[in-house]
């Protein structure tokens, strides 16, 4: 029915001594499991932003980014949750967010889903707002 059941920050954990981090796959699994508890599993779908390399991004940064993407795909595959992918240009164009600042997506998400406003109260919550809008775009445009 297009219901967005939850949104949370990507769990991370420290790696090594250089203040680096990586996604915490176990915690991602736990968060997803908790979010879909009691839901009809046949109606659950993971919508992931299909991103690619960005100009000026270093090799290590791109490797870590790709690794995180792969972790998500692996978790959803293991949980037998179907996935679909949405390009940034498509969802941003749909919500009229092309060439806007990062905070514009937070404002748009709060306007559409005011019940998530407490989870989007800080500027650093723009990534969660993006996730909400990606899900909303998918629901409004997907051909089931």
Where are these regions (language model features)?
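Phosphate- and other anionic-substrate recognition elements at nucleic-acid/protein interfaces
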Residues: 1-144
